[in-house]
């Protein structure tokens, strides 16, 4: 994208505030016009003083312009600040909502820390552009456009000096941007690397401590920051050179104006006040050119950040619900997969031509080796991914025609990784049903056998669980997740090895709660511990994304196939009678 395209798209984010932004910009343009009048008035004052006939009216007018300009600038700047801050806050909220709505495959491919870093840096960059647009960008352009003809009307020769000064500024800026284009892109790449390393290390700090990686990870970060500085320094050097060249040009221009102006005053072609006015014009021009240079630097440095953000924004635009999708209501729980296929990009993993039917209220266990596609099936059911072929139906309705919100309201999931947020225990359980009362939360916790450890905490249900629930044990986190699913009370239940983190005694208590929860609900059990699938009405054995075996527990146990072999390996199939031993 060109710099102009990047800038124009940045301004399009202000569309919702169009009226207020237009008023602020218009006010700044008026202020820019007033600043051009000030040097002229000051020149008149000097002429009046030189002639020995000071004009009080002009003096008061000049002072009034200055006071008005100052007060108006403060008010306009205040409004511009509020608009820019407000738009940044709304942008963060909007982009955050779109990002978290994306499928897991998008997050795995993009990287959560990368998306977060891109969003945060872009929001700060856009904030700076919006603020300067409202404060200076258009005002600077208008001031420069008006300054030249005004100066021409006073003296062509001195005006040419100002024009040459402007051309020098433009040439220097163009040269530096050409020299630093690749370097600035490299700087942004290194920033992403640094942020990703910090985020990755801190999120896995327990591993870092366990394997004594503190020094190694710190050294790695030092290496990354050194590479960042190696890329940053040449860019900074070029802009420092540009600043020096601009200062030389502005000083030389002022000197030339004074020399030529003195000669013209001596020859009687100009008054002293005219020269003073031109010096004011020169100072004004230099200030505006400096603003242009800062704008050029700003948009140039923003280029890599915003290009990455625009790619991010474009990639999340397609998650809007298709027009015409309807809500899923009065769900019985009949589920059917019809020749469903889905492949992950650049891998051999996924599911291939999967077909099965689950009647309302039945329990189906999905087993198989790691990477067989068990979790993928459940993600397809919840429209985390969309099938590339085939259909998934609930109560006879293709879920691709159902709104995601109503679909997911009908499914309660207990993940193997409990998914605990950095909030209170009550807040984590309330995720199951936002409008749940405190009494509802307590009942759900009791059903999940969680009240014992909750009540042992000083703050009880108000206990802050820490980041990812790190102040709780694995079993405690899992029981909160089960309580959340109980509270949701959805007609379809998904258990992703829900008791895997529990000890034997707690597992028995939770199993009773889960058995009650499964009643009159369609239940999917993703099983790694095969002792949990005994009571399933139907068992699917997946391997490499395909259904290898399907049938009842006892049927598959006696069949002597892949499922029976897995039971035998797990110690759940007796060699003498080849029957499953009920565990628990």
Curated annotation (Swiss-Prot):
It is an enzyme of class 7 (translocase). ATP binds at residues 368-375. Pfam families: ABC_membrane, ABC_tran. It is a multi-pass membrane protein. Residues 335-569 form the ABC transporter domain. It catalyses: [(1->2)-beta-D-glucosyl](n)(in) + ATP + H2O = [(1->2)-beta-D-glucosyl](n)(out) + ADP + phosphate + H(+). Its EC number is 7.5.2.3. Residues 21-301 form the ABC transmembrane type-1 domain. Disulfide bonds: none annotated. Keywords: ATP-binding, Cell inner membrane, Cell membrane, Membrane, Nucleotide-binding, Sugar transport, Translocase, Transmembrane, Transmembrane helix, Transport. Signal peptide: none annotated. The keyword Zinc does not apply. The chain crosses the membrane at residues 29-49, 57-77, 136-156, 158-178, 248-268, 272-292. GO terms for cellular component: plasma membrane. It is found in: Cell inner membrane. One of its GO terms (molecular function) is ATP hydrolysis activity. Homodimer. In NdvA the ATP-binding domain (NBD) and the transmembrane domain (TMD) are fused. Involved in beta-(1-->2)glucan export. Transmembrane domains (TMD) form a pore in the inner membrane and the ATP-binding domain (NBD) is responsible for energy generation. Belongs to the ABC transporter superfamily. Beta-(1-->2)glucan exporter (TC 3.A.1.108.1) family. This is Beta-(1-->2)glucan export ATP-binding/permease protein NdvA. The gene is ndvA.
